[in-house]
C-alpha cells in the first residue's frame, strides 16, 4: 500500500501546550519529515489550528494519539496526498469560471 505523503488536519486543542511543543511532538512521529501548525481561531480555553504534516507514513493513528494526548480533538481530515509524488489540487471548471 502506498504511503501518505501529506495530511492536513483541523484540530481543536487547549492553549497549553503551545503549538511549538505540539509541532515538536508531531515531528517525532516516525515517518513525519515536517510539521506546520497555524492558529486560525482563539477562544477563552481552546484554539483551532490547522496542522499540515509531510513525510512518508502508513497511517495517521500515531498522529491522532499525539493530538489526543495533549487534550486535543481532530475535527476533520481536510487534505490527503498519497503515492510516490505530490499531486497538487486543481480547480474544477466551475471554480475557474466563478
Residue ranges and their predicted role:
Residues 1-98:
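Long, contiguous binding/interaction regions
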